Each structure stands twice: as structure tokens, then as C-alpha cells.
């Protein structure tokens, strides 16, 4: 009898200990399942919309090119039609942005950063259709823009939409789902889940509230977005450059030199972007007609440029494998680099709905390949492969300009599937980042956000000054 009683007591003690352990575990992990569920919904929606946006842009581009092919034998029709089609498509994007959702202009990433700090509004019912349709117009016109900016902003706005639909009122949920959508958007644009996570942690580090709940939600959203992307597009890397050879240790100093070059180029590029933005602002002065006509002219010129020098137009994804393969001479690579710098400045700084990641990756590829080809001639004993410098250059310009070296490294490695180049990439991107910081360069997105907030404050101050006068009349 005593044995049965002691056995019963022992079993009860074990059960109580298990319950206590479970209770402690539940107290330790306070992640609300509702937020994780909504993060999965946000990631799935962002993946679906991101894939739809990519397909829609490709459809518009194919329709435009197909129309040009029909009149390819008639030069007197081909050139005007190339200008008109691209101009009309671009004007659609500029008009929608200016008329209905000014915050949908440009990349959209600074807007998400501002929204994470509760400094910028998130009007998803306006931004989602304007960014999607406007991006179809500008990117479909062949302008030098990327789709990553739109998908990041679309993802963030989808996060806020889901929050409103489920009527979540907590500030933590609002912040977390916005960041989750942005990370899922980058992942959906580049098929780069780890880069999407790092982008939020690194690039948006001043705004992102890193805690157990938010990081789990970001992971969940990125996973769902990546799964959706791969269901529709497969698992192949989006930039096919083939498997490149590893960089020997005795050649790593060349990658540091390349990083120094990009450390000088990055701040200059950022300065040119801001100066070009000011130039366009002085030109149109906020008038919608001037702004739309200006956008149409830029879009039309990109359409013409696509006939003359196709490599100088478009986002750049098609150019990267060709340039990295060494199909161009050093002189031609530098010429295309300069041409694309000009077109990137015109397209992005004018406020067109579109990103700058893809154009920067193409610019980095061009300059990196040119450096690699020149180094191969100067140092034949190393048996250098120019493609490895192209890969390093892709991330270096982004690291120097955006000041997000980890994101640049991981993004390029995921996009190209050349993980063996991680060491030369670290050397190049770190050198570019440190020198850009030493030269006083400011991160591009943070600077654009600061200018946007300054403009917002000036407009609010002007309204407050005019309010008494309006009330007295």
C-alpha cells in the first residue's frame, strides 16, 4: 500500500514539474500567435502581388516590343512609335503618382522607413493601386528603374492593410507587420530571403524595433513570400552567371582596390541623385502638367535609347549576365556605365515609381567587370576571371551608396548562387563602405527620407501660417 502511495505521489510530482515547465515556457515565449499568423498572411500576399507585378511589367514590355517589331522594317514609323509608346506608358505612371498618391513616387523604401517611425502616412488604399499600375507604366516603358522598390513599398502597405482588416490596434503589431511586408517585398523581388531579413535589420536599423516578436514575424513573412515566389518562378537564381572560380588569396588585394574605387563612386553617385532631384523640382515646381510631360519625355527618350543602345535602357537584369561574361571591351563597359549613370539619374531622380537597386547592381557589374578585365591584362600571372570582379562590384556600389554592406553581400550571393565568392565580396564591400563613410557620404535612403520630412514640415508650417488668415476672411 505504501509502495502504491509513493508511486502515485511520484507520478503527481512528475506531472506538476511538467506543468510548471510548460507554464515557464509559455511565460518565456510571449509571441502572440495572432501576429505570426498575420505575418504569414502578409508574406503570402506580398509574394503573390510581387509575382503578379513582375508578370505585369513583363507583359507590358513584351506588348511594347511586339508593337515595335511589327514596324521594324519601316524606320519612319519605328522611331516615332518607340518614343510615343514609352512616353505614354511613363506618363501614366507619373500622372497616377502626382494625382492620387505622391508618396508612391520614387523607390518607396524611404517612405517605409518614415512610416516605421510614425513620421510618414501609410495610405494603402491609394498606394497599392498607384504603385502597381504606375510601376507597370514606367518599368514597362523601358525606363532605368528596378522593381524592388515598388515591391518593398507594396509589401509594407499590404502589412498595414492586413492590420486594418483584422482591426489590430497595438503599436507593436502595426510596426511589426509593416516591417514584415517590406522584408517580404525585397525577398519577392530578388528571390533572396536572407537578404530580405538583413535588409530590415541593417538598412532600417534606426527604425526597426528589434525584439523577439518582430524578428519572428519578419522570418515568417519572408519564408511565405519566398515559397510563393518559387512556386511560380522555380528555384533557379534570377541572375544566371554560371559558377565562377574562387578568388586565390594572393589576388584579394585587388578586391580591396576595387572597394576603394566604389568607396569614391558611391558618395559621388548619391550626390548626383540629390542634385538631379533638385534640378527636376526647380523645373516643374510641383505643377502636374509639367511633371507629367517631363516624365513622358524621359520615358520616350528611354524608348529611343532602347533601339540605339539596348544595354543603356531597362532595369539591368538582362545586362548583368552579358557584362559579367566579358562580352564587352573595357572601353565599351565604361561607356555603358556612364550612359546608365545618366539614365539612372534621369529616371529615378524625376520621381518615377520605381526602384534603384537593380540599376545600381548593373552599374556595379559594369565597373567591376571593367576593373577585372584591366587587372587581367596588367597581372597575367594571376589568371584572373573578370566575372568574379563583376559579382564583387554588384554589391560594392550598393554598400557604398545605401550603406548596407551585409545586405549587399548576401543579396548578390543569393541572386547569383556564387557563395564561394563571399570572402572577396566582404573585402570589396567593407572597403567601399568604410571609405564612403570616411569621405562623409550619407546613406542614400536616409538622406531622401530626411529631405522628404523637411519638405513635409515646411508644408505644415506654411499651412499653419495661412490658417489664421483664411479664418479671418
UniProtKB/Swiss-Prot annotation:
It catalyses: 2 chloride(in) + H(+)(out) = 2 chloride(out) + H(+)(in). It is a multi-pass membrane protein. The record marks 203 as: Mediates proton transfer from the protein to the inner aqueous phase. One of its GO terms (molecular function) is antiporter activity. It comes from the Bacteria. This is H(+)/Cl(-) exchange transporter ClcA. The record marks 148 as: Mediates proton transfer from the outer aqueous phase to the interior of the protein. A motif (Selectivity filter part_2) lies at residues 146-150. Chloride binds at residues 107, 356-357, 445. Belongs to the chloride channel (TC 2.A.49) family. ClcA subfamily. Residues 70-76, 233-252, 310-329, 377-386 are periplasmic. PANTHER family: CHLORIDE CHANNEL PROTEIN (PTHR45711:SF6). Disulfide bonds: none annotated. It is found in: Cell inner membrane.
